[in-house]
Amino acid sequence: MSNHPLLQCINLCKRYQEGQLHTDVLRNVSFAIEPGELMAIVGSSGSGKSTLLHLLGGLDSPTSGEVIYQGRSLNQLSSTAKAELRNRELGFIYQFHHLLPDFTALENVAMPLLIGGSKPAEAQEKAHEMLAAVGLAKRSKHRPSELSGGERQRVAIARSLVNNPSLVLADEPTGNLDQRNADSIFNLLGELNVRQGTAFLVVTHDLQLAKRMSRQLEMRDGQLQHHLTLVGAE
């Protein structure tokens, strides 16, 4: 492991204000992710998990505190620089795959490369490689409507990894799948972690799946618990 964290957040706070009323969604959240680490953050709906992920990915800005990615403070980056970082260095997986319905699996996976300026032939070749890595080489010409739920999520995983990111942020990646497909997706994440050295931060309410990660933290009422009391509970 590196001497420096891959990503670090320091005293992150997020407050939503409406008139005289305010809601503190995150309160002084601090932790670090090491290169190649598999980390899960568990918590119930409304605990602040998704908000935290948005801040870590530069999709939203904290009220106070700081996110540092490979030595760069996201607070200091322009919107354009944040977009470039997300496209080139971070991957995202969501509960609902967010695939473009009119494009094939191959075209969906190639999209981040094309946005980043890759030549179409190079983008398609890399997209083919990633679809093969997730077991969908023979489904590359199918559109999302022609794929099962598990297959669509595999396409989304391939898309998240096509730029060889150091870190993938996954928001309830198995929340829309049955148990068999959920198990398959988590097994795949573990395989890709070993094969490519990609770090994964997964937020989930599924305790059994969270146990498969190398480290688990708990989000409770906007605060991060570094001693996980929920894992192992019935």
Curated annotation (Swiss-Prot):
Cross-referenced SMART domains: AAA (SM00382)
One term under GO cellular component: plasma membrane
Membrane topology: Peripheral membrane protein
Positions annotated to bind ATP: G43, S44, S45, G46, S47, G48, K49, S50
Enzyme class name: translocase
Keyword Cell membrane found: yes
CDD domains: ABC_MJ0796_LolCDE_FtsE
Assembly information from the UniProt record: The complex is composed of two ATP-binding proteins (LolD) and two transmembrane proteins (LolC and LolE).
Family statement: Belongs to the ABC transporter superfamily. Lipoprotein translocase (TC 3.A.1.125) family.
Name the UniProt record assigns to this protein: Lipoprotein-releasing system ATP-binding protein LolD
